């Protein structure tokens, strides 16, 4: 794996099972990906968004949530740490900000982290909410 690669959907699924995500958390993550990709696919032509990065970060944003239910660790921080150790640096940066967003610039260009953050807030459990 090259440094800072983005895992494929198959690699994301393998990680989901390797780290024993609960079925309800998997379902939530899949819905977050659906919303994220719906946003990404409907952006104004020419908007520079890495669709693969959005998909991977959406699927993996709760990668350590199952274990955090027992350890009480912050799953955004532990998930980012795990993904950095695996070499997925850009995915890790998005995962780390899906709970507490930082450095938002309303006038700036849209970023992948904003899409995943927003999509996660629009999905409660496995339902899309307004």
Model regions and ranges:
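Short alpha-helical hairpin
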Residues: 1-13
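Divalent metal-dependent catalytic cores for phosphoryl transfer on phosphate-bearing substrates
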Residues: 16-19, 44-130
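A positional/architectural concept
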Residues: 14-20, 24-44, 55
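Short acidic/polar alpha-helix capping motifs at helix-coil junctions
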Residues: 2-4, 41-46
């Amino acid at each position: 794996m090259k440094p800072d690669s983005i895992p494929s959907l198959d690699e994301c699924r393998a990680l989901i099972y390797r780290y024993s995500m609960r079925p309800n958390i998997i379902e939530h993550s899949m819905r977050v990906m659906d919303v994220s990709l719906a946003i990404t696919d409907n952006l104004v032509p020419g908007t520079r968004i890495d669709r693969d990065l959005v998909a991977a970060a959406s699927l993996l944003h709760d990668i350590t949530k199952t274990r955090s239910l027992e350890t009480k660790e912050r799953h955004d921080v532990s998930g980012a740490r795990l993904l950095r150790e695996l070499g997925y640096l850009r995915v890790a940066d998005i995962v780390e900000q899906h709970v507490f967003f930082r450095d938002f610039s309303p006038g700036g260009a849209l970023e992948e982290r904003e899409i995943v953050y927003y999509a996660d807030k629009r999905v409660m459990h496995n339902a899309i909410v307004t």
